[in-house]
Amino acid sequence: PCSILGKSILFLSRNKEFQYIPATTESEAIGLASGAYMAGRRPVVLMQNSGLGVSINALTSLVLLYKIPLFLVITWRGYGGNDAPEHLLMGKWMLDFLKVMNIPVMILSKDSNKNQIVNFAKKQKNQGITTALILKKGVIE
């Protein structure tokens, strides 16, 4: 799992209010979340942006094709060129990939407030669309 989400994943896995299901790949997580949606749940997929590349086929041939509304939380590794070399290209192109797939994006910053996040989540639910909440390193603890 992404180190940016480490504490969040630990919280979710220990909290009985949530059903945290770890996946071996991001495309597997997309498939599990799609099935959960079809079973009447409101899934959230947590992934590192390198996993976005792995999941593009699952997003385009399943989620977007069949209009399955998923809430993606994607960490922005490689943002601003400050990261390990393997994260730099995806960090540079991630927003472009999401734009090409017509997936609305909200970039969470330390200045974002709770109402902005709630409104973004409501838009996702009300419009029945897949959206992506982008997290930069250091925004969440």
Task: Show the residue positions of the predicted features.
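Thiamine diphosphate
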Residues: 1-141
